[in-house]
Amino acid sequence: MTGDKLSNQMWGGRFAAGPAAIMEEINASIDFDQKLYRQDIEGSLSHAAMLAQTKIISHSDYEKIVHGLQLIRQEIETGSFTFSRKLEDIHMNIEARLSELIGPVAGRLHTARSRNDQVAVDFRLWVREAAQKIAQALKDLMEQLLMRAEQHADTLMPGFTHLQTAQPVTFGHYMMAYVEMFGRDLSRMRDAIERMNESPLGAAALAGTGFPIDRFMTAQALGFREPTRNSIDSVSDRDFALEFLSAGALCAMHLSRLAEEIILWSSAQFHFIRLSDAFSTGSSIMPQKRNPDAAELVRAKAGRLNAALMGLLTVMKGLPLAYSKDMQEDKEYVFDGVLNLELSLAAMMGIISDLEVNKEAMKQAAGSGYAIATDLADWCVRELGLPFREAHHITGRAVALAEQKKCSLDELSLDEFQTLHPDINAAVFDVLTIEKSVESRNSFGGTAPSEVLRQVAYWKQHLVTA
């Protein structure tokens, strides 16, 4: 049977002529939705089992349908299946092949089902599986960051605001900041999985069906928590895809921030880290170059996730209930988003696991830029009882004096300090080191090594069940 006749047979009973060539061109989605073949077959197998259980079809017909679907799955996975654009999508391609294999019995499979709920369940299954893989990749990256944080709980480096040296911190503390970000990403992904874990199968076109189906049976068979509660919403909803892309875009944004730091830190101007050969490239003209291309691509791919989210939001904006063909455009945005997020997470995992930390360069930079100025102000508050604003002013004058003399704060003499305030005494020099500065920041969540290790311990335990 030819493709155009099959296509017409599926839905064309009231049409006198076939579609125009350009209609077939714009209507076909098989080039991309063939990714859903496994989910489509799983959905059909569970639907067929339910139809047999409820005696809507005979057990004999059910066995023929199962056998045919299993053959089709084998053909697709071995590359012998021929996809036809004339048959529009993965659902009709599989149904047409099933008709060729088992004859008219194949037509019974679509009893009490529409392509509207069929594609909705296929897509939910696919997105749920993708989200679970992303969640695992996030956990793996967090574990790698935790290992780095534990190794470098006391490795000194400068902390920045406005990309200017602010206060000394530790590299471990910095890594833990990203653990927190990715922890939120993981939580959002788990929440999205929980919300999408309802089966739309059985909603039919939009109004449900008059056949005595068991939606709870198919939901359970497909691993869903329960069936969706409103048949119109079931086929209209793409929130699950949007929520996944939203969580993915946030994750990609966090990855891009870490990528930017890696790009800066690996530059000759910072020299904080060295990227491995595996995640660097060279220049076609400048032989000395080590370009952080992997990190740059991770940084850029955040734009792909943002574009996917904005694209699907725009497709769905203003659509009346229930299903509209516009919704066919949902899949490419999600497929592209998943591909680029998976690549970004895998690349960042490799970058973090392979990079070398230059402790000496970090420590030297941590002591530059008068990073311990805040410690001087805090000492004036604690030891001299000064209001913080007055202590801030005194410290600012101390920095100006040190800049004038081209020296560090701890190189100022006691006499020079006492010109700023007569009560300053020799004990002030005890706090004017980056080591003391970091050790003193032991408030909950702070940069002190003891606090960093506490944060590491918390997340190690939390990730066991996350």
Curated annotation (Swiss-Prot):
In the record, biological process GO terms are:
arginine biosynthetic process via ornithine; L-arginine biosynthetic process
InterPro entries recorded for this chain? Arg_succ_lyase_C, Argininosuccinate_lyase, Fumarase/histidase_N, Fumarate_lyase_CS, Fumarate_lyase_fam, Fumarate_lyase_N, L-Aspartase-like
Location relative to the cell: Cytoplasm
Q: What EC number(s) does the entry state?
A: 4.3.2.1
The enzyme class is lyase
Matching entries from Pfam families are given as: ASL_C2, Lyase_1
Question: Its catalytic activity?
Answer: 2-(N(omega)-L-arginino)succinate = fumarate + L-arginine
UniProt keyword list: Amino-acid biosynthesis, Arginine biosynthesis, Cytoplasm, Lyase
Q: Which GO terms describe its molecular function?
A: argininosuccinate lyase activity
Q: Which GO terms describe its cellular component?
A: cytosol
Q: Which NCBIfam families does this entry report, sorted A to Z?
A: argH
Record-stated family: Belongs to the lyase 1 family. Argininosuccinate lyase subfamily.
Output this protein's name: Argininosuccinate lyase
Q: What is the lineage of its organism?
A: Bacteria, Pseudomonadati, Pseudomonadota, Alphaproteobacteria, Hyphomicrobiales
